[in-house]
Amino acid sequence: MRCEWEGCQEEIGDNVRGHLLSHIEKDEEARCLWKDCARYGEAQASKHALLAHARRHTGERPFECHLCGKDYTRSDPLKKHLLRHEAVDSKNENLIRKIEYLGQLLAEYRRESLRIMNDIESIRYNIQAMSRKIAYETKGNKSSL
């Protein structure tokens, strides 16, 4: 990439920050002198602010989120972004706890359902056994009449 700072046409290599600092250090007023910049000649609050502004021109985004890879020209938006990850993590933890609780309720429901089904099956078996006994005894009483 070619540097568009006033009076410079150098190719900027890997050391973008160092090259920008060489221009910024020369200007006591911390003004952006990048060709065609909407803020050309405006003084920034500090040299650090000017460096952050100049990254817009170079595309340098040195502050990267280690969780998702999103990158920024300054550290403060990255910090704000990381807080969103923490909020999502906290929300996810709450959801996971709720899901685990629902899983426990479901397991308890299944155990209780099986117990009830076994009770019903046992009652059905007893009714059938009693029906057979009554039928047998009733047959025996008819023959003695």
Swiss-Prot record:
Tell me which SUPFAM superfamilies the record gives.
Answer: beta-beta-alpha zinc fingers
The record, for Pfam families, names: zf-C2H2_15
Q: Which GO terms describe its molecular function?
A: DNA-binding transcription factor activity, RNA polymerase II-specific; transcription cis-regulatory region binding; zinc ion binding
The C2H2-type zinc-finger regions cover: 35-57, 63-85
Query: GO cellular component annotations, sorted alphabetically?
Result: nucleus
Q: InterPro entries this protein is in? A: GLI_C2H2-zinc-finger, Znf-C2H2_ZIC1-5/GLI1-3-like, Znf_C2H2_sf, Znf_C2H2_type
Keywords, comma-separated and alphabetical: Metal-binding, Repeat, Zinc, Zinc-finger
BP terms from Gene Ontology: positive regulation of transcription by RNA polymerase II
* PANTHER family found in the cross-reference section: INO80 COMPLEX SUBUNIT 1, ZINC FINGER PROTEIN ZIC AND GLI
- Report the protein name in the record: Zinc finger C2H2 protein ECU06_1150
